[in-house]
């Protein structure tokens, strides 16, 4: 088999948001616990909640809700979660920060001619608020979220980015912190990079066969530069 070829046009980096670009672990964990408490249920705790981050909200909640919680109960939990998240987000002390080096990485990729997309389990409202609050609109050429189509790990959001930006799978990389991100990228036949500073562990990302797992923004940048030069992240 011949070695992979570098992209013939601008490469495309597709980023997850929560746990990849922004450290939202604390606020998401607290919001999920508050949602369960509002329904009189035992809070799941962060170690359970982290396993379902990235999925569309109702699908995620259904996975961790106690047996006996029906579809209406899941919908109520989702509404409680949204309300708790909005309330917590209004507290300046609860603002989820960009990870160190994330802004600089986006600036570097843009300067090198990359196109940048987003594939996130956030709602459209949540994604728009994130982009506005962090002043990131100048970086993203396309962005798709849970409101636009099927949940991760379905390939939809990656394929939508590809179609919107007229890119082929071999010209794109999916970057994310969960197995759902990696499987979504694999289902769309694009290269995948796992980052181990978010919700899923390095071992979990290796188990789902990410092309490479990185631990720092500089390692992520190096993998993306390799992709632009050689068509592979390793």
Features from the language model and the residues they span:
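Substrate-recognition "cap/lid" segment bordering the active-site pocket of phosphatases
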Residues: 95-97, 117, 123-174, 179-188, ...
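Nucleotide-sugar donor-binding loop of glycosyltransferases
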Residues: 196
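N-terminal helical cap/lid subdomain that shapes the substrate entry/recognition surface
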Residues: 6-17, 21-104, 110-112
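Short acidic-hydrophobic, aromatic-tinged amphipathic segments that line or gate anion-handling sites
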Residues: 212-216
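Hydrophobic patch in the ABC ATPase nucleotide-binding domain
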Residues: 41, 136, 210
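Substrate-recognition element of Asp-dependent hydrolases with the DxDx(T/V) motif
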Residues: 32, 102-131
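Glycine-rich phosphate-binding loop signature in dinucleotide/nucleotide-binding domains
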Residues: 6-8, 111-114, 165-171, 227-231
């Amino acid at each position: 088999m011949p070695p992979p070829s570098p992209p013939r046009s601008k490469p495309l980096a597709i980023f997850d948001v929560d746990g990849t670009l922004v450290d939202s672990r604390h606020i998401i964990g607290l919001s999920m616990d508050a949602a369960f408490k509002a329904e009189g249920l035992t809070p799941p705790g962060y170690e359970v909640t982290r396993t379902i981050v990235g999925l569309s909200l109702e699908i995620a909640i259904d996975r961790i809700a106690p047996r006996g919680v029906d579809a209406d109960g899941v919908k109520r939990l989702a509404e409680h979660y949204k309300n708790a998240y909005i309330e917590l987000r209004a507290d300046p002390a609860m603002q989820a920060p960009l990870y160190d080096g994330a802004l600089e990485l986006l600036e570097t990729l843009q300067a090198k001619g990359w196109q940048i997309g987003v594939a996130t389990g956030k709602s459209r409202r949540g994604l728009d608020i994130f982009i506005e609050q962090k002043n990131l609109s100048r970086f993203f050429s396309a962005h798709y979220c849970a409101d636009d189509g099927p949940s991760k790990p379905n390939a939809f959001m990656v394929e939508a980015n590809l179609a919107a930006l007229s890119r082929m799978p071999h010209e794109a990389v999916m970057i994310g912190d969960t197995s759902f991100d990696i499987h979504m990228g694999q289902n769309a036949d694009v290269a995948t990079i796992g980052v181990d500073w978010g919700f899923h562990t390095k071992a979990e990302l290796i188990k789902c066969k990410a092309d490479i797992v990185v631990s720092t923004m500089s390692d992520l940048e190096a993998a993306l530069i390799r992709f632009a030069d050689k068509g592979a992240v390793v």
